[in-house]
Regions:
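Non-heme Fe(II)-dependent double-stranded beta-helix
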Residues: 1-15, 21-106
Length: 106
């Protein structure tokens, strides 16, 4: 079953990105959020703790091969969306970093 609608495909072609709603289950999202907080070793209820290393100004975290990230990258709906975009089933799953951009300090 196709993940991308004709409108999604046209948006991709025009803008170079597309948003896939509900691409992974909510449990997967919660696992990534928990993994990020654990990696940062900060108190998610204490905003003052959010602004110390290892958070860079760009928000990129050197959190590479974490299972929660792999689970999302390999999720069937994500795979199928990339397969439709690139026109092939022969895809390699790669890993990337996570990002944490806390709001500006009050």
């Amino acid at each position: 079953m196709a993940v991308l609608s004709p409108e999604d495909r046209a948006f991709w072609e025009e803008n170079g990105y597309v948003i896939i709603h509900d691409a992974v289950p909510r449990e997967n999202l919660a696992a990534v959020v928990d993994a990020i907080w654990d990696f940062l070793a900060v108190d998610r209820t204490d905003p003052e703790s959010w602004y110390k290393a290892p958070i860079s100004k760009a928000g990129m975290l050197e959190m590479y091969p974490h299972q929660a990230l792999w689970d999302n990258r390999q999720h069937p709906k994500v795979y199928e969306a990339f397969s439709e975009i690139w026109g092939t089933k022969e895809l390699w799953v790669s890993f990337d970093r996570a990002n944490m951009n806390p709001p500006a300090r009050p």
